[in-house]
């Protein structure tokens, strides 16, 4: 006689918690698996996703604001006044949603000019 999935579910639903724990333990031993392993594997898969878009944030202009303003103008295409206002309003986001190599190149350019930069 073969039981349907629904009959199995009904039989499990009628059991007490301690009986279900015993059933799970018996199934783990019979099939050589662990119920906890499947649950633990799910968060690991989500954590494995690598970030692909980055934001470049000017944390501090540093001592050489003129060089930083020039670097910001070159990187963003802003006018002199807009770039100056952006640098003076640090911390400020310079570029959003760019690739990692582009973000790292921009960070290096701005740090060479004397700024403190973060990639988020």
From Swiss-Prot:
MF terms in GO: mRNA binding; structural constituent of ribosome
UniProt entry keywords in alphabetical sequence: Ribonucleoprotein, Ribosomal protein
InterPro entries assigned: Ribosomal_bL12, Ribosomal_bL12_C, Ribosomal_bL12_C/ClpS-like, Ribosomal_bL12_oligo, Ribosomal_bL12_oligo_N_sf
GO biological process: translation
Signal peptide (from-to): none
GO cellular component, one term: cytosolic large ribosomal subunit
CDD domains xref list: Ribosomal_L7_L12
Source superkingdom: Bacteria
Assigned protein family: Belongs to the bacterial ribosomal protein bL12 family.
Job description of the protein: Forms part of the ribosomal stalk which helps the ribosome interact with GTP-bound translation factors. Is thus essential for accurate translation.
NCBIfam families the record matches: L12
HAMAP family referenced in this protein's UniProt entry, alphabetically: Ribosomal_bL12 (MF_00368)
Subunit and interaction comment: Homodimer. Part of the ribosomal stalk of the 50S ribosomal subunit. Forms a multimeric L10(L12)X complex, where L10 forms an elongated spine to which 2 to 4 L12 dimers bind in a sequential fashion. Binds GTP-bound translation factors.
Record's protein name: Large ribosomal subunit protein bL12
């Amino acid at each position: 006689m073969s039981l349907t999935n629904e009959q199995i579910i009904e039989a499990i639903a009628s059991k007490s918690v301690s009986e279900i724990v015993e059933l799970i333990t018996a199934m783990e031993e019979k099939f050589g698996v662990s119920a906890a392993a499947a649950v633990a594997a799910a968060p690991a898969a989500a954590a494995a996703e690598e970030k692909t878009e980055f934001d470049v944030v000017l944390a501090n202009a540093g001592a050489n604001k003129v060089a930083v303003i020039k670097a910001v103008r070159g990187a963003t295409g802003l006018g002199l006044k807009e770039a100056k206002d952006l640098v003076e309003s640090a911390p400020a986001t310079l570029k959003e949603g760019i690739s990692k190599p582009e973000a790292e190149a921009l960070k290096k350019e701005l740090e060479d000019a004397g700024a403190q930069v973060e990639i988020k």
